[in-house]
Regions:
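NAD(P)+-binding Rossmann beta1-loop-alpha1 motif at the extreme N-terminus of oxidoreductases
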Residues: 1-63, 88, 94, 124
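Rossmann-fold dinucleotide-binding core
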Residues: 5, 96-175
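Rossmann-fold NAD(P) dinucleotide-binding segment
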Residues: 50-62, 67-113
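Active-site-proximal catalytic alpha-helix in oxidoreductases
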Residues: 129-137, 158, 163-194, 204-217, ...
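Interdomain hinge/lid region at the active-site interface
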Residues: 167, 176, 213-274
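NAD(P)-dependent dehydrogenase/reductase Rossmann-like domain
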Residues: 271-293
Length: 293
């Protein structure tokens, strides 16, 4: 019999995850504080509360923006653990500071359940195309027992080891992402200032040795000033970078490029580009170059 999966958080990442699982024949029950019309239209079953998911599902996954949100849906009056279930596996797909993950894990285990630290990486379109990467960590037994669920969410779910390893890998990955986006903006601004054709730059540089996935995704957006629809808002990058910096500082690892990137993303919060796609960071680079795109 197919597993019942509870999914809390049906936003830009959660909704395509739900659709992927439903397409693989998994019965997905979801909870979101706002409307769940798209989820229902995809074949999902709405739940009245996180507690209801804890009572009826074989496994519960959370994909939420902050530790406060995760704590509320797990430990609140109508939270998952209010169900009183023992042995329930909970997979947190959120990107949170490691100390917060550890704190949440301790509370989950005290309630007799198991938490997997399994942040997901990728923009919504990547997730919808089954190309989002899940960095799974925690109990290998729980991962193996629920491999079908992980494989239903994406074609790229990796088990990395002990709890917390997933978040560490996500921080390393996102360090690259933040730097690659800014590097793409800097290089393209240089090319524009040198009089190179915009479309030709995108066409020639995308398959070149200097390319990256972020260049391939965002160079066309930068050159067309197309910052909507939003794949990932600049404000989200600005929110997450302090976590990466703290992680590196705690390890005594200098990250000069990340610090420069952080300055740009922080500046962007005070601009009209804060809630536009992070490709709009090129506007600040252009401003520093005293040029118009």
């Amino acid at each position: 019999m197919a597993k019942k999966v509870g999914l809390i958080g049906l936003g830009a990442i959660g909704q395509p995850l739900a659709a992927n699982m439903i397409a693989k024949g998994i019965e997905v029950h979801g909870y979101r504080r706002s409307a769940m019309d798209a989820f229902v239209a995809a074949g999902g079953k709405p739940a009245a509360s996180p507690k209801a998911l804890g009572e009826s599902c074989d496994i519960v996954c959370t994909v939420l923006p902050s530790e406060h949100d995760v704590e509320a849906v797990l430990f609140g009056e109508n939270g998952v653990l209010a169900s009183g279930r023992k042995g329930l596996p909970i997979v947190d797909l959120s990107t949170l500071p490691i100390p917060d993950k550890d704190s949440i894990r301790a509370k989950v285990e005290a309630a007799g359940c198991e938490l997997m630290d399994s942040p997901i990486s990728g923009v919504p379109q990547m997730v919808a195309n089954r190309a989002g990467i899940i960095f799974a960590s925690g109990s290998k037994a729980v991962f193996d027992a629920n491999k079908d669920v992980f494989d239903a969410m994406t074609d790229k779910a990796f088990y990395l080891g002990e709890f917390g390893t997933g978040t560490k890998m996500k921080f390393v990955a996102n360090t690259l992402v933040s730097i690659h986006i800014l590097a793409a903006a800097e290089a393209l601004a240089l090319g524009v200032k040198a009089g190179l054709d915009r479309d030709l730059m995108v066409k020639v540089l995308s398959p070149s040795a200097g390319s990256s996935l972020q260049f391939q995704v965002r160079a066309p957006l930068m050159m067309n000033k197309q910052y909507e629809p939003v794949l990932a808002p600049t404000s989200l990058m600005s929110k997450d970078i302090p976590q990466f910096l703290q992680f590196a500082d705690d390890l005594g690892c200098p990250t000069p490029l990340l610090h420069v990137a952080a300055e740009y993303y922080t500046r962007a919060l005070e601009t009209p580009w804060a809630e536009k796609d992070v490709a709009s960071i090129i506007e600040l680079v252009a401003e520093d170059n005293k040029m118009k795109l």
